[in-house]
């Protein structure tokens, strides 16, 4: 994606999941928070907006969904300590959603991370993280030797996901994934987070999807990508491949009207 679009925050209006279907009741002060760290579409840097990324904060644990350009800085601006990062979920492997995955992990480590971080996403997320650690092995080794830091690699646990289903559960959250259509990729995922006080669904990039509708049933909050087709045509009108590019972009994403139907 290389055009402007906003992630649309849509409350679904239905009741949240009954309490007995949720993880353990949250302790006082452990309410679930959602922070939109970046809503820009496409990898091209913007003056005022950062790449696709969201944070869900449950107690003192931070869950990051997608790692677009600037995610670590946006966390700092939002007052989210990088050392409290516990899970990273990548929806799909386009660069505007994963370009800062490795940087986020390394910067969290530099910021005092000593607790393992689980990274989830479509293949080849495990290989990508290994490649990033090799790319930065000189800096990492120097910081371990010179600054007395613990090794970074053992702190990162990566998980290649399949087509959907249960992903992770503990006493505070249950995470479920669903496969969504985002050609030409073979696998793109949406995620649902059920906590004691709310249910949040992150669509990632997708066309209108019945699987996403099922995943988001009775959720409290849906963060859904949205594309303005006319705006796409305006942005590409001076490019030599404008017709093919516009046709590709519009067929791979969700219009505002379609998002309304999903919600």
Give a label for each model feature.
Residues 2-5, 9-17, 22-201, 207:
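Binuclear metal-dependent hydrolase catalytic cores
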Residues 189-190, 197-199, 207-263:
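Cap/insert and terminal regions of metallo-dependent hydrolase folds
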